Amino acid sequence: MNSDSSSVSSRASSPDMDEMYLRDHHHRHHHHHQESRLNSVSSTQGDMVQKMPGESLSRAGAKAAGESSKYKIKKQLSEQDLQQLRLKINGRERKRMHDLNLAMDGLREVMPYAHGPSVRKLSKIATLLLARNYILMLTSSLEEMKRLVGEIYGGHHSAFHCGTVGHSAGHPAHAANAVHPVHPILGGALSSGNASSPLSATSLPTIGTIRPPHSLLKAPSTPPALQLGSGFQHWAGLPCPCTICQMPPPPHLSALSTANMARLSAESKDLLK
């Protein structure tokens, strides 16, 4: 009886065990399925997370590459512009130096120094200093020449003319009425030869007006030299340099003076005896 009851109880209890086993197995299977599902989701999310930084990095790299290419193009353009600017500056400087060398060569050609092949070419500074000194020397020489010419031909031209009475060109009425004194020798010769000479005393003023006498003939006590300026001296005994005083004497006056001078010399010899 006891054995039967135990078997019955064991049989009665066996469906519960099966149900419990099945429930536990189903729960484990469901849990495993959830875990596998969660693992797949997490792996998918991890893959997505891994893919996202790669894409961002690739995008950033592409953007940086584009910017670097733009910068390189801009840099290349700027280098070309700088090269063109350098070429323009070098050409302008080369032209300036060429023009300067041509100007210096032209200045050296007119400088007063030896142009032989053995002479070393002057530098630019030496050429400019030599040109400055040469210009200063020419300027001082020109000023000195102007001063000398002004002293000779400037305000001292009146000293060239004879006597204190002006020429007949300035005052024709006064020159026609002026009576110039005659040299003592010429006056003595004319007075001694009045008996034999057809000339009269009234003709003497006419002779004097033809050729004005020298101031030395009027004043015997004239100093040996008349200062006409610092660069010119009019020595006694020399003829007047003006054109009016250089007129030749009349032929009858020159013949008369020669004959009378010979006559006076003979008379002086007789007096000495």
Swiss-Prot record:
Protein keywords: Coiled coil, DNA-binding, Nucleus, Transcription, Transcription regulation
Keyword Transcription: yes
Coiled-coil blocks: 69-90
Annotated compartments: Nucleus
Primary location: nucleus
Compositional bias of kind Low complexity: 1-14
Composition-biased stretches (Polar residues): 37-47
Keyword Zinc-finger: no
Domain bHLH: 84-138
Any GO molecular function: sequence-specific double-stranded DNA binding
GO BP term (any one): spinal cord motor neuron cell fate specification
This protein's GO CC annotations: nucleus
Ranges where the record places region Disordered: 1-72
Protein name: Oligodendrocyte transcription factor 3
Record InterPro entries: bHLH_dom, bHLH_transcription_factors, HLH_DNA-bd_sf, Olig3_bHLH
Record's compositionally biased regions (Basic residues): 24-34
Purpose of the protein: May determine the distinct specification program of class A neurons in the dorsal part of the spinal cord and suppress specification of class B neurons.
